[in-house]
A protein has these predicted regions:
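Active-site beta-loop-alpha junctions enriched in small/polar residues
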Residues: 24-26, 68-72, 96-99, 144-146, ...
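Active-site acidic/histidine proton-transfer and metal-coordination neighborhood
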Residues: 3-13, 90-91, 103-209, 213, ...
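N-terminal pre-domain/capping segments
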Residues: 1-132, 313-392
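Structural recognition of alpha->loop->beta junctions
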Residues: 168, 200-211, 235-238, 309-323
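Gly/Pro-rich active-site loop or hairpin
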Residues: 32, 36-43, 191-199, 221-308, ...
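Hydrophobic faces of well-ordered beta-strands that scaffold small-molecule active sites
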Residues: 17-23, 31, 63-67, 89-96, ...
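A structural motif corresponding to the C-terminal end of an alpha-helix
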Residues: 54-62, 130-135, 168-179, 207-212, ...
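Generic structural signal for well-ordered alpha-helices
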Residues: 7, 49-53, 77-84, 124-129, ...
Length: 392
């Protein structure tokens, strides 16, 4: 079978791929030392949405943009929804924020003070109200909660309070909505984090019910973690709800997905396909999303590169000859099984993807098309004055 014939067989699955982009990727970001401004950075959520729509226009891969509350707070979310739809995209996941208020210094959903816990719960109720207006499905919760020193907090008590708070929030989740709980092994807390790993997240969402899932951020693991195994396990348990794709060299670097280890991205996507999260045997509804900060590079090209990286590794993962791989595995042929796996990884699908795009009225090279479009120069000329959006 020729490479082109093999690609033709997987092309229909690529047609359905959607990678949600985060609104905050278009704003300024940085490290704990410095946030750098950049020309053309959005000043409003509408300008963020316009930039997200540009990514979708050139790639056909990003039909939704995630919101972050309160960073993207507006008076009229129904109008914001119409604005996005007029640009050809929709409003996606709503992300809560309980890490930038002084009241949450020692915890939010885990705090010992019931008034502060209720304040954090009420914020999530606000996010659910936003979802009702925007038509969003997923409420994503990442908690920057934990302790820095042994003895600082009651580990068991914090888990109990977290479970109670999540249960209260979950009661307000609609029948067509989902709660996804993200984990991160450290930072900003350094001794212990309240949701540090997939097991803790799974324990909480399993207790909540069938509309609660785990969000897996690829940068939120200790170095050397076998992330694809976690993917396989969560799909097996029916609790993988979404991805936050990014890349890392050391910690939670939030770099362009696939930049540090494209082979890892390939392995992850293979397990997504193998486990029914995407592709010919899909049974689970797993949302693909980026969570990245373009601290020094231009934001829109960074997002274009990111969604293309996910698409390319998805195509390669779909090309794995599953029948031959299974036969080699069952025969105990270690080297042949690895060879079959690596053959797919080393397949250069870029020319095939370029042709695939042209057949669908998209530019063969989205990055070159964007750079030649004049959009970047236009926003840099137009967005003068005002306060640039950013997470600080």
């Amino acid at each position: 079978m020729t490479q082109a014939t093999r690609f033709d067989r997987i092309a229909p699955f690529l047609d359905g791929q959607a990678i949600e982009v985060p609104s905050w990727a278009y704003g300024n970001s940085g490290t704990r030392f410095k946030v750098f401004g950049s020309a053309g950075t959005p000043r409003t959520v509408e300008e963020k949405i316009a930039d997200a729509a540009a990514v979708h226009r050139f790639t056909g891969l990003a039909p939704a943009v995630a919101l972050h509350i309160p960073w993207d707070k507006v008076d009229d979310y129904a109008a914001l929804r119409r604005y996005a739809e007029d640009l050809g995209i929709r409003l996606g996941t709503v992300n809560s924020n309980t890490f930038q208020d002084d009241d949450y210094k020692l915890g939010a959903l885990t705090h010992t003070d019931p008034k502060i816990r209720q304040k954090a719960i009420d914020h999530h109720f606000e996010c659910l109200d936003v979802m009702d207006a925007t038509g969003s499905r997923d409420l994503k919760i990442w908690l920057a909660e934990g302790t820095n020193y042994p003895g600082q907090g009651d580990l068991r008590g914090r888990q109990d309070r977290l479970a109670e708070s999540l249960a209260t929030i979950y009661e307000r989740v609609g029948e067509e909505q989902r709660l996804v709980l993200e984990y991160k092994f450290f930072e900003p807390a350094f001794y212990h984090t309240d949701v540090p790993d997939w097991g803790t997240s799974y324990a909480h969402v399993a207790a909540l019910g069938e509309r609660a899932f785990v969000c897996l951020d690829t940068g939120h693991h200790a170095p050397g973690t076998n992330i694809e195994f976690i993917v396989a396990q969560l799909l097996r348990l029916g609790k993988l709800g979404s991805f936050d794709f990014n890349s890392r060299f050391y910690a939670d670097d939030d770099l362009i997905v696939g930049a540090a280890d494209p082979y890892q991205l390939f392995r992850i996507l293979f397990e997504v396909i193998r486990g029914g999260g995407f592709g010919p045997e899909a049974t689970a509804d797993v949302a693909f999303m980026l969570d990245q900060c373009h601290n020094i590079e231009k934001k829109i090209p960074g997002q274009i590169r990111s969604v293309l990286n996910v698409q390319e590794m998805t195509a390669r993962a779909l090309l794995v000859d599953r029948d031959a791989l299974t036969a080699a595995q069952e025969a105990g042929d270690v080297l042949l099984a690895n060879e079959i796996f690596m053959d797919a990884f080393y397949t250069d699908v870029r020319p095939l993807l370029a042709a695939w795009r042209e057949e669908r009225g998209l530019p063969a090279d989205p990055m070159r098309a964007y750079l030649a479009s004049g959009y970047q120069e236009q926003i840099e000329a137009d967005r003068i004055g005002g306060t640039q959006a950013g997470w600080n």
